């Protein structure tokens, strides 16, 4: 099953997290913390891959940023979570909307950081056009997203 899921581009970790959140009916803060654990895992894996495999590093770093967006959407209990829950998955448009709403609360740096993560996803992973240097230049933006999200969820 795992290999079949990977062939079809299904993120098994994401699938498991989503299923557990739904099955256990987790509260927003527990959901945020679980997503931040996954974000930290992706961040660490991404950092480790920058010099070895920039394309995979790009995707891991993007996934870290994506999990931060989902974590903070839960933390701030954004209204769009209802639509996401009904559909059972996030769309790119909903991720973008969540980024905008989160940015209104935490500052414009969040949109800037997301834009760097999106470049990693598109140009670093899908197009495989970014080398280790280019990925390394963008990694600190994702690191800030993870660090600040952990701070925000611990403080509030």
Where do the model's predicted regions map?
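Short amphipathic alpha-helical segments
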Residues: 1, 8-21
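Short, charged, low-complexity loops and linkers
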Residues: 17-27, 47-51, 98
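Short, positively charged interaction helices/loops
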Residues: 26-48
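Non-transmembrane, amphipathic alpha-helical segments
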Residues: 31, 49, 53-57, 127-130, ...
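Generic structural signal for well-ordered, non-membrane alpha-helices
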Residues: 37-44, 63-70, 115-118, 144-147
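Hydrophobic alpha-helical packing segments in soluble, helical-rich domains
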Residues: 54-76
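Long, charged low-complexity segments
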Residues: 73-156
